[in-house]
């Protein structure tokens, strides 16, 4: 099976693959060249996931702006 480009994966698939890549890298069992390839793939997956999150946030903002009664507040990932 061909490896999909990160931007063509769903958010969930990208995060799942990223988790797998991180686990493989953390194991320390990969030869250096393989580890570098996995690291590169992981960076691509993380960037694609972040882009999908940004797009989702923008869609939510647009939907909230369309509702005249809704108060729009900036998204802050650090709010707990």
From Swiss-Prot:
Major localization listed first in the record, in broad terms: cytoplasm
- Alphabetically list the UniProt keywords: Cytoplasm, Exonuclease, Hydrolase, Nuclease
Q: What is its EC number?
A: 3.1.11.6
Can you state which reaction this protein catalyses? Exonucleolytic cleavage in either 5'- to 3'- or 3'- to 5'-direction to yield nucleoside 5'-phosphates
Q: What class of enzyme is it?
A: hydrolase
Cite the GO molecular-function annotations of the record: exodeoxyribonuclease VII activity
Annotated GO CC locations: cytosol; exodeoxyribonuclease VII complex
Instruction: Please give the HAMAP family that the UniProt record associates with this protein.
Output: Exonuc_7_S (MF_00337)
**Assembly description:** Heterooligomer composed of large and small subunits.
Name the PANTHER family on file: EXODEOXYRIBONUCLEASE 7 SMALL SUBUNIT (PTHR34137:SF1)
Question: What's the family?
Answer: Belongs to the XseB family.
Q: Under what name is this protein listed? A: Exodeoxyribonuclease 7 small subunit
- Per the UniProt entry, what species is this protein from, by scientific name? Aliivibrio salmonicida (strain LFI1238) (Vibrio salmonicida (strain LFI1238))
Q: What is the lineage of its organism?
A: Bacteria, Pseudomonadati, Pseudomonadota, Gammaproteobacteria, Vibrionales
The gene coding this protein: xseB
């Amino acid at each position: 099976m061909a490896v999909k480009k990160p931007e063509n994966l769903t958010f969930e698939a990208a995060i799942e693959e990223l988790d797998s890549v991180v686990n493989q890298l953390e194991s320390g069992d990969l030869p250096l060249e393989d580890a570098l390839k996995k690291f590169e793939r992981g960076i691509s997956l993380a960037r694609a996931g972040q882009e999908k999150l940004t797009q989702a946030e923008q869609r939510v903002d647009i939907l909230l702006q369309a509702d005249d009664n809704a108060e729009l507040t900036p998204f802050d990932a650090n709010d707990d």
